[in-house]
Amino acid sequence: GIPYWTYNNGDEPLVAISLLDTSNIANQLDSTPRVFYLGGNPEVEFPETQEEQQERHQQKHSLPVGRRGGQHQQEEESEEQKDGNSVLSGFSSEFLAQTFNTEEDTAKRLRSPRDKRNQIVRVEGGLRIINPEGQQEEEEEEEEEKQRSEQGRNGLEETICSLKIRENIAQPARADLYNPRAGSISTANSLTLPILRYLRLSAEYVRLYRNGIYAPHWNINANSLLYVIRGEGRVRIVNSQGNAVFDNKVRKGQLVVVPQNFVVAEQAGEEEGLEYLVFKTNDRAAVSHVQQVFRATPADVLANAFGLRQRQVTELKLSGNRGPLVHPQSQSQSN
């Protein structure tokens, strides 16, 4: 669930051996190893298990689509999925351009169509990166983790009988993230509602105004259940192979299951907004937003990974300053 990149700055070839612990407590999927690439056009790393997933996906999409979008939507989806194997290749260029407030050419490069370099990219001239002092940051993180682990063992923790059991996360003043044109997001977890620690659950309330977008993101440590409580919109979910496993309109009363680490994006309809609740199977569910990942990634890494010019990298990193809630029309007007 944590995005990372590696770079060999030495004079000799580097051979790295990765151990994937699928029985880890943080893994809430199954024992099938999956690698989610944000960029490039990677080769399949686990062909035995990935082929089974691909067969199931093809069987699913070979069925009649019916009222969920029709043959035209199915053909468009299959065309998009032929371009690459990264998770961003499962989104259309138009949608990525709206989400990241970039030009169409930049959005196409983010989808990595027909990129022959696969997972490994050769950097001409080396990377120019400013390295922060990491030791102090690591020590601070260790101290914070120690303090968190000691919480609940100081004799002052709440008992189950005295725990607060209700929280209204739909209140506008309660919003954790807010965009006056796009919408708001509120969360409740064991830090704000301690009883959730015993249930191992957390919740998220999302309100999107008309055409508002909750940009592509994924849950690092939880599966989630999305329940629409008002309005209508569209939900798109992409798996580790870059396939859009779900791309449909949703309306009041409908449920959508989003597996851990699968990238998901939501957009409200043109006629009315979209309000929904997300129930997550972790009392401290963590979310990664693609925009924020790009913002934190060194410019040279983005330029080489996606084949972008410096100007394109700059506009891509600036999109991370706007947050995960986006309104396409207001972004185009700001340009």
Curated annotation (Swiss-Prot):
Composition bias type Acidic residues, residue spans: 135-144
Signal peptide: none
Quaternary organization: Hexamer; each subunit is composed of an acidic and a basic chain derived from a single precursor and linked by a disulfide bond.
Disordered: annotated span: 47-87, 102-155
GO molecular function: nutrient reservoir activity
The protein's name in its UniProt record: Legumin type B
Organism encoding this protein: Vicia faba
Alphabetical list of Pfam families matching this protein: Cupin_1
Sequence similarity: Belongs to the 11S seed storage protein (globulins) family.
Keywords: Disulfide bond, Seed storage protein, Storage protein
Taxonomic lineage of the native organism: Eukaryota, Viridiplantae, Streptophyta, Embryophyta, Tracheophyta
TM stretches of this protein: none
Cupin type-1 domain location: 167-314
Role, per record: This protein found in the seeds of many leguminous and non-leguminous plants is the source of sulfur-containing amino acids in seed meals.
InterPro entries, A to Z: 11S_seedstore_CS (IPR022379), 11S_seedstore_pln (IPR006044), Cupin_1 (IPR006045), RmlC-like_jellyroll (IPR014710), RmlC_Cupin_sf (IPR011051), Seed_Storage-Functional (IPR050253)
Superkingdom, natural source: Eukaryota
Gene label: LEB2
Positions with biased composition (Basic and acidic residues): 105-118
Keyword set includes Heme: no
